[in-house]
Structures are given as C-alpha cells and as structure tokens.
C-alpha cells in the first residue's frame, strides 16, 4: 500500500525541515514532549488566559517540536480542540491549515519564540473559527 506511513504514533528518528524551518533533532523530541506535557499540566489549571490563548500556545508549541514524520499540524489542531473541550466548548473548531493567515500566525509566533512565544494572532484565528462554527450552529436552530 503506497503512501501509508507505518510509524504512526512513533516519534521521528530523522531530521526534518519545512521550507526554511529546521526542526529539532530526534534525540531531543521525547524529553521536549515530556516537558511540554508537564508545562501544560501546570499551566492550564492556574492560567487566567483565555481558552483561545491556551489552545494557540499548545498548538504552536507542539508543531514547533514537530515530533512525527507526518501529521504534526493535524495533531496540533486536535490538541487545540482538546484544550477548548477542557473549557467546556461543545463543538470542535475547524482550524484550517490551508489558510494563509494560519501559516502567517505560526510564522509570527516563531519569530517571537525567544521573547515568550507571541501566539495572539493564532489565538485570534481560533477565536474567529470558533465564532463561525457557533454562528452556523445558531443559525440552523429552529427557535
């Protein structure tokens, strides 16, 4: 079966890059992922940030690690939705990876990574996506 990746769920063992972006070496992935999970588990219950900001932070952090050969963007968007669900959001929010604004927001967050990871533009995209899904839902209700 051509095109099927058989290493799903397994951290990558080779270097990867996308465009001009070179991601961390495979040797650092497991430790960095454990650190991300610990940081999220400490951050989530105590933060005063909006759910959109937390979702954007986790999405960007995950795709920056780029732990898998394929599917990192999809998994990051699933994690962003997991954050929103943890705040009581009832619907998944479709965050389009094909959107130029989405790509731009990831690059902006990369640019400010050393200064504390400014993911506010990405949070706004998630907020707008959420607004669209709720607006669509409400417009289809028969009141």
From Swiss-Prot:
UniProt-listed InterPro entries: Fido, Fido-like_dom_sf, Fido_containing
Pfam families hit by this protein: Fic (PF02661)
Species name: Dictyostelium discoideum
Keywords linked to the UniProt accession: Membrane, Transmembrane, Transmembrane helix
Subcellular location: Membrane
Domain Fido: 1-128
GO cellular component: membrane
Topological type in the membrane: Single-pass membrane protein
Keyword Zinc-finger: no
Superkingdom of origin organism: Eukaryota
Membrane-spanning intervals of the chain: 49-69
This protein's name: Fido domain-containing protein DDB_G0283145
Matches recorded under PROSITE patterns: FIDO
